[in-house]
Regions:
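Flexible, compositionally biased loop and terminal segments
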Residues: 1-130
């Protein structure tokens, strides 16, 4: 069960050991995070670095975000039946697919993850196009 790994104090080391050589999937789990704060902080960093407005493009702005080395998510799984992104990864989710699950996060398990990934696998990715 996912909950056991995430909330166990040894979970971080366990997950690192089991996924350290993974080169196919990145999993983002964010606690106490706000997308609006991240965008405001990125703007402040660019201003403090002396970047001129005409020098700012999408790539420049993306490099000022909290985790610029991580790729944008392909999939957001939103638990607890809420159908909103709730101030989460506002910049990075631009082209992500969204899957909404009724179960709350603490009860979300491997079977639920497999179902969400299966739903995602049947999507036609358009990256903003039609």
């Amino acid at each position: 069960m996912i909950r056991a790994v995430v909330f166990d104090p040894r979970g971080h080391r366990f997950v690192q050991a089991r996924t350290g050589t993974n080169d196919r999937l990145d999993l983002w789990i964010a606690f106490d995070y706000g997308g609006r704060a991240e965008l405001a902080d990125a703007a402040r960093r660019l201003i403090q670095a002396g970047i001129q407005p005409d020098e700012i493009d999408e790539d420049t702005f993306a490099r000022a975000l909290y985790e610029p080395e991580l790729p944008d998510p392909d999939l957001l799984i939103r638990t607890a039946g809420d159908q909103r992104i709730s101030n989460f990864l506002l910049w990075q989710l631009a082209y992500a697919e969204l899957v909404f699950v009724e179960k709350p996060w603490p009860d979300f398990g491997e079977e639920d993850l497999r179902a969400a990934l299966a739903e995602y696998a049947h999507r036609e990715r358009r990256f903003g196009g039609r």
